[in-house]
A protein has these predicted regions:
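Post-signal-peptide N-terminal segment of Sec-exported extracytoplasmic proteins
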Residues: 37-61
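Calycin-type beta-barrel ligand-binding domains and close structural analogs
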Residues: 20-28, 81-143
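C-terminal motif of bacterial Sec signal peptides marking the signal peptidase cleavage site
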Residues: 13-16
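N-terminal helix-cap/turn-to-beta initiation motif at the start of protein domains
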Residues: 26-42
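Generic short beta-strand segments
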Residues: 43-50, 78, 124-130
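Sec-dependent signal peptide recognition
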Residues: 2-10
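Short, well-structured hydrophobic secondary-structure segments
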Residues: 62-92
Length: 143
């Protein structure tokens, strides 16, 4: 359970507008992360949003149910924010092979792309993020 929590934190909590990390640096690291194996079933995660200056803006908990059919992983996410707001997102992730993934969700612009090596996953996408009564387009580079 501790390793599952650790990977959840890595995947969902650490994001920035630009990244100097390189997925190749994780090649051969253990334990090997296989996205579809990791997220099948129930997963809990916690996360945060921070501004470009590193100031904490918001925290959340997310309950995730993952199901696999053919070469598709579906993640049904239910968010609860620290201010009581609730939200949800359903990811449809295609398992492309060679440690590569692509995904869509209703608030994602275009298609997300992902690649894994060793015990890491890099997941990139553009999201229409709700802020008050409006939305802003945000680039995510999740590790």
């Amino acid at each position: 359970m501790t390793m599952r929590f650790f990977f959840t934190i890595l995947i969902f909590l650490i994001s920035s507008c630009s990244s100097q990390m390189n997925i190749e640096k994780f090649k051969g690291s253990q334990p090997t992360l296989t996205l579809e194996d990791y997220f099948e079933g129930k997963t809990e995660a916690w996360g945060m949003f921070h501004d470009r200056f590193g100031n904490l803006k918001r925290t959340f908990k997310v309950d995730i149910i993952g199901t696999i059919e053919s070469n598709t992983l579906t993640l049904d996410e239910k968010f609860l924010y620290d201010d009581g707001e609730q939200d949800s997102r359903v990811w449809t992730i295609k398992i492309l092979g060679n440690n590569q993934y692509s995904g869509t969700a209703s608030d994602v612009v275009g298609e997300a792309t992902g690649i894994s090596e060793g015990n890491a996953l890099n997941w990139k996408y553009k999201l229409n993020l709700k802020v008050g009564d409006s939305t802003i387009l945000v680039d995510f580079d999740d590790w």
